[in-house]
Swiss-Prot record:
The keyword Repeat does not apply. Zn(2+) binds at C73, C76, C89, C92. GO terms for molecular function: nickel cation binding; zinc ion binding. Keywords: Metal-binding, Nickel, Zinc. This is Hydrogenase maturation factor HypA. Involved in the maturation of [NiFe] hydrogenases. Required for nickel insertion into the metal center of the hydrogenase. Pfam families: HypA. Ni(2+) binds at H2. GO terms for biological process: protein maturation; protein modification process. Belongs to the HypA/HybF family.
Length: 113
């Protein structure tokens, strides 16, 4: 259920940006969520609708873009796609991978008034 606290944090960012940028309403929020971020998109959508009620983001559309997980294989030097932590490198079989994408959760774009 950490999606609720994530949505509260997103709303806090929107409110801070509203004060500094001068917008009064949010129409669309586009989030990038990494495949390894342990975030359930449907739960996030549900909590976003609940948390934004009565705020500048009420009724806004939440768009979620999933960022595929990628890692750097230390032994063979290849950039590879991974499905989960501790996957083996599909090129050489090593498990010495450093994740370079797929853990993020960030606001990519806002549509505001």
């Amino acid at each position: 259920m950490h999606e609720l606290s994530l949505c509260e944090g997103i709303l806090q960012i929107l409110e801070e940006q509203s004060r500094t940028q001068g917008f009064i309403q949010v129409h669309r929020v586009c989030l990038e969520i990494g495949a390894l971020a342990s975030v359930e998109p449907e739960a996030l959508r549900f909590h976003f609708d609940v948390v934004t009620q009565g705020t500048l983001a009420e009724g806004s559309h939440l768009e979620i873009v999933t960022v595929p997980a990628q890692a750097w294989c230390l032994p063979c030097g290849e950039k590879v796609s991974v499905g989960q932590y501790f996957d083996a490198c599909p090129q050489c079989g090593s498990r010495q991978l450093q994740v370079i994408a797929g853990e993020e959760l960030r606001i990519q774009q806002l549509e505001v008034e």
